[in-house]
Amino acid sequence: MKKALQAITAISGCGPGYCFVIIDALADAGVRAGLPRALAIKLAAQTMAGSGKLCVESGLHPAQLRDQ
């Protein structure tokens, strides 16, 4: 159980930081394409949220979703 708790802590503790890096990169691309930064951030964050929801609710492996 202790080992599982360490893995859970690593994923849940570090995971959001990686999500924020991806959101920032997507938003930067949106700004370079001409979107206002606030809108680009909102779109990128909603994309990340929707993707996470799809991954949880579909039951498919993330690689399957990526390849669709």
Stretches found by the model and what they are:
Residues 4-68:
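Helical "substrate-binding/catalytic lid" subdomain
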